Amino acid sequence: LQYVNNVRTRAYGNTSGNITAGQLNLQFILDERGRELYWEGHRRTDLIRYNLLTSGSYVWPWKGGVSSGTGVESKYNLFPIPSSARNSNPNLSQNPGF
């Protein structure tokens, strides 16, 4: 809790953004990481780690090509392997679903 409040005090410039122990849960930490590490490229990995990228339990507008958002196939947890890499190394096989 103290570390989260330290980060929020730095960001807000005062303690107005501090939280209580009751507000600290996994969803809060995931959301805070999304804000704090916005340009660092961690969001997709975090969503995969917590099984939220492809599931329907966590949606955002236009997820899955639907305006209200929807779950998508689990194949999207992995990227396709480029054909140039597979041509260079015949031991590579394409990730499932691609």
Where is each model-derived feature located?
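Acidic/polar-rich alpha-helix caps and helix-coil junctions
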Residues: 1-98
